[in-house]
Amino acid sequence: MLKEIMNTAEDKMSKALLALKKDLASLKAGRANPAMLDKIEAEYYGTMTPLSQLANISVPEARILQIQPWDKSSLKAIEKAILVSDLGLNPNNDGTIIRLIIPELTEETRRNIVKTVKKYGEDTKIAIRSVRRDGNDKIKDLKSDMSEDDIKKAEEEIQKITDNYVKKVDEMIDIKEKEIMSI
């Protein structure tokens, strides 16, 4: 039972870290990255569909994203979805391909992106600590089946797992901050 609680807690913490990785990848950091478009969906035959399912997204140059729809009829819908997104990019549509030119980031924009990165990191840490709290609560529910020492050891083990994941979050945030500020 104890092992199951630990595994569940670690699995949930791992998922929180994976969500952070996705969020960080979707941030505009001055370089073209197909993950920037992960959250954008375009209407395709009446259904909102992720761009990755509508087109091939490539990076021909460091600051250019190229979107080549598999169905040319979806070109306008993709262009519209990009325009209404919060990316702030202007698509160049040549009739077959959409090109997105990623502008150079100003110092102010970089600082705002770093604030967002830190917020994502803090939200992830809160999620990880929440998982720790849930795990500790489940361990305390087993009080009748375990000795005080075993409960203490289990709580310490969950704390070690938590510390490890919080450290990973800090490392990811530091790397992303340096990437944004060094462009």
Curated annotation (Swiss-Prot):
Pfam families reported in the protein's UniProt record: RRF (PF01765)
Top-level division of the source organism's lineage: Bacteria
Major subcellular site: cytoplasm
Compartments where located: Cytoplasm
Sorted UniProt keywords: Cytoplasm, Protein biosynthesis
An annotated Gene Ontology molecular function: ribosomal large subunit binding
GO cellular component assignments: cytoplasm
Example GO biological process: translational termination
Biological function: Responsible for the release of ribosomes from messenger RNA at the termination of protein biosynthesis. May increase the efficiency of translation by recycling ribosomes from one round of translation to another.
PANTHER family associated with the record: MITOCHONDRIAL RIBOSOME RECYCLING FACTOR PSEUDO 1 (PTHR20982:SF3), RIBOSOME RECYCLING FACTOR (PTHR20982)
NCBIfam families in UniProt: frr (TIGR00496)
Similarity comment: family membership: Belongs to the RRF family.
Name of the protein: Ribosome-recycling factor
Species classification: Bacteria, Bacillati, Bacillota, Clostridia, Eubacteriales
